[in-house]
Amino acid sequence: MKCPLDKNDMIMVEHRKIEIDFCLECSGVWLDSGELELLVGVLNAEGADLHLNELLSKPAGQGKWRCPICAHKMNKIWLGKGAKILIDSCPLGHGMWFDAGELQKVLREMEPAGAPANTTVIDFLGTAFQATHGKDSKG
């Protein structure tokens, strides 16, 4: 799959049967439809019934990047519960694009308040993506 930003080939990283497409050049992440819900479910087993519709806002307008699957221009949407993050989403529902660091921010935002969250996925993402660039794990 090609990166929507720089058109470079992305690598596929798999964790707990969730495929994450990662661009080595810009550090962006593509999640196919349904994969964000799977990541949220891994983070918070009790909140696994959380639906993506609860986290999405209405589109904030059309973005300039195209979906790597269907080539339609993606919509800009706000994602999250509190401190929302502006991401790109395919208008046909193929998936979502996260610029460098945005996926980790969204996942941290979705951690349950006051409960020890399973941060394995966030730690894995940070370590895997930083390792591909030879960076240390400071964050």
Go through each PLM region and give its residues.
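The feature marks the first
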Residues: 1-21, 135-138
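Short cysteine-rich clusters marking metal-coordination/redox-active sites
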Residues: 3-6, 23, 67-70, 90
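Short Cys/His-rich Zn2+-coordinating modules
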Residues: 4-10, 44-55, 71-76
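Short functional micro-motifs and their immediate structural scaffolds
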Residues: 10-11, 31, 75, 98
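Short, flexible, mixed-charge glycine/proline-rich loop motifs
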Residues: 12-17, 54-66, 79-84
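Residues immediately within or flanking Cys/His clusters that coordinate Zn2+
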Residues: 20, 28, 64, 87, ...
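Short metal-binding segments enriched for Cys and/or His
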Residues: 29-45, 94-111
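Short, intrinsically disordered terminal segments enriched in charged and Pro/Gly residues
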Residues: 38-57, 107-139
